[in-house]
Amino acid sequence: ANIGYYSLIFAKLVGKNGKVYAFEPDPENFRLLVKNIRENKYNNIVPIQKAVTDKSGKIKLYHSMEHRGIHRVYNPGGKRKIIEVDTTTLDQFTNNKIKPKVIKMDIEGSEYLAVSGMRKVIKKNNVIILSEFWPRAIRKCKTSPKRFIDELKSYGFKINYIDERRREIRPIDYSSLMKICRGGKAVNILLQK
């Protein structure tokens, strides 16, 4: 969730009867997220100070000293402070009681780990996923971009590229997606069944 920019947008979209669950493991970002929610008077955002991954427990977070939005679960080098943060899975968090309609992920290459921890959620709900796709970071998290896409397709998701320059969303295959990401580029994808 970082400091809540998208959480506030989604909270407005879901209205008073909807809920936004905003996960942010970094203590300082979490403090700013809570402050942002309070100052904007949103009662339908539930902040959770945990990272979403493939298991519940603890994980090392390599904390960026330059940019509060690029903390990672792998060591990317550079000046980093290591902190230990709590983790959860969406399967455990929802516990068959919360039925998400939309999941937004921009977790610096850890998206495959998060998907691995939400298999029940994906199977039981007709969920839409908005996700960052950054092959370089996915590899640093010890999986392959193809494995991530294949996992999503195995649940029946169609992959769509969000072309921000052209302001359009269009279906895309894996090889075309990888061509767009050449040179270390990260893009956003929309996944729908």
Region roles according to the model:
Residues 1-193:
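Phosphate/nucleotide-binding beta-alpha loop and adjacent structural elements of enzyme active sites
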